[in-house]
Amino acid sequence: MAWKVSVDQDTCIGDAICASLCPDVFEMNDEGKAQPKVEVIEDEELYNCAKEAMEACPVSAITIEEA
């Protein structure tokens, strides 16, 4: 299975918890907002990591959906 990861740039407040919890999937861009390092995750371990980051996001800016 594969999952698509996205971050709503208008919603993100740049607290970087996602990049801290899951640095293989998320990074901070030049504007101080989170962005995915990869658009599609095929590894279940990375999916679980990204899901944890999504649940920890204080403004619900992260979306994960089946690709």
UniProtKB/Swiss-Prot annotation:
Cofactor(s) this protein cannot do without: [4Fe-4S] cluster; [3Fe-4S] cluster
Cysteine disulfide partners in this protein: C22-C49
Residues annotated to bind [4Fe-4S] cluster: C12, D15, C18, C57
GO MF annotation terms: 3 iron, 4 sulfur cluster binding; 4 iron, 4 sulfur cluster binding; electron transfer activity; iron ion binding
Signal peptide interval: none
Co-factor: note: Binds 1 [4Fe-4S] cluster which readily converts to a stable [3Fe-4S] form.
Pfam families per UniProt: Fer4_13 (PF13370)
PROSITE patterns the record matches: 4FE4S_FER_2
Domain 4Fe-4S ferredoxin-type: from-to ranges: 3-31, 36-67
InterPro entries per record: 3Fe4S_ferredoxin, 4Fe4S_Fe-S-bd, Fe-S_cluster_ET
Assembly with partners or alone: Homodimer.
Role, per record: Ferredoxins are iron-sulfur proteins that transfer electrons in a wide variety of metabolic reactions.
Protein known as: Ferredoxin
Organism for this UniProt entry: Pyrococcus furiosus (strain ATCC 43587 / DSM 3638 / JCM 8422 / Vc1)
Lineage of the organism: Archaea, Methanobacteriati, Methanobacteriota, Thermococci, Thermococcales
